[in-house]
Amino acid sequence: MTVEKKDLDWGNLDFSYRKTDYSYVSNYKDGAWDEGCLTTDHSITLSECAGIFHYCQEVFEGLKAYTTVDGSIVCFRPDMNAQRMADSAERLVMQ
């Protein structure tokens, strides 16, 4: 399913899951990210040792982007979002 930008109900977007035609996947290895790729496979593979299965710490900060009257896309206070993420990670000793 393809949804055109003009057909989205921008005022009511939330953080619930919305399946898209493609997902972007990039891997981090040896201190660097690879070039990544688009895929139609929406599944992920997790190691049995993944912290998410072991009551680990986690931080979520939602950054939203909006379309302005002139059609530009802007992020709402990304600097403050990044600071909140860093503060939360520090509180959980994740830095």
Short names for language-model regions:
Residues 1-95:
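Conserved alpha/beta cores of soluble small-molecule-handling proteins
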